Amino acid sequence: QTHAQHGMKVLLDRLEINPADVQLWPCPGIDEVPKVRSGRARLLRDALLPASAVDTWRQLPPPPDEALEGLRRVDCPGPDEEAGVIALMLREVLESEGKSAALVTPDRKLARRVAAEMNRWGIEIDDTAGVPLAQTPPGSFLKLAVDLVAGGFAPLQFLAIGKHPLTAAGRPVAAFRRFVRELEMSVLRGPRPAPGIDGLLAGLQDETRHLKPVLLDLEVMAAGLSELLNRPSVSLIELVGAHISFAEALAASEDMPGPARLWAGEAGEAAAGFISELLDSAASLGDLSGASYGSLFDVLMTGRAVRPRYGGHPRLAIWGLLEARLQHAELIILGGL
């Protein structure tokens, strides 16, 4: 399905037309398009044989010299080394004025590693596949918020969202970080506290009583969502509404409201769009048990991506399989093979 002509093939099949019967559209200058070297084309065709035909590789003759001209294979011991080598090759291209390069890979983890390596040199490179919404700050924050309440403020879930950059609970960000560190040292390490805010309050000592107001505020913020998650049957609209109310309250800082922090930037806009679509379709999904909401939210967010609109380097790119068939660069790197 990633082939550039897949859609045309499907159309011809539905129209019951043989591809050989399709006439060429007259186009002046079409003969001037450079022809692909036959040896290289044959090499790529043989390399991409379906799994059922790879046994024929043993009978294939060695590829001609022209097929291997300009090709280089780099074997790497691991994904980190592979990302480093690719980043160096991309960086080297920038030393030649006007030269372009692209990494082609179906491996999104490799793409993110390469982008991170390029960032060390201050080079922004766009991945056309985007970043999974769940791995962006707003997406992960929304997921952690529901996990926190569903998990009864368990230590692991509390620390995961407590150390998230968007979490402030209406206080200065630095002050909330200090609160989390103190709570971690005094209550969250050692024997597991009882579930809920009451369990955390019970673990406070005289020297940490000053943490109590923050915990009580968190209990008030989460009360609506907590009550719905414990219902055996509740509408998705109610759950999403309570979830977002809690997330926005948790994201608020002393000088900025929660919505302004949570929905800012491209990732925030993508998260807001996802929530809007979820609310639009919630009525058709009917009621569900509150305990299943967290899993449902994770599943629905899967596959959503945040794609950059602009800002990447004009001569470097990371392409998926379909984009690579439709574009050209002086240096093409195939990664994650």
What residue ranges belong to the model's regions?
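Polyanion-engaging groove/track-forming segments
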Residues: 1-337
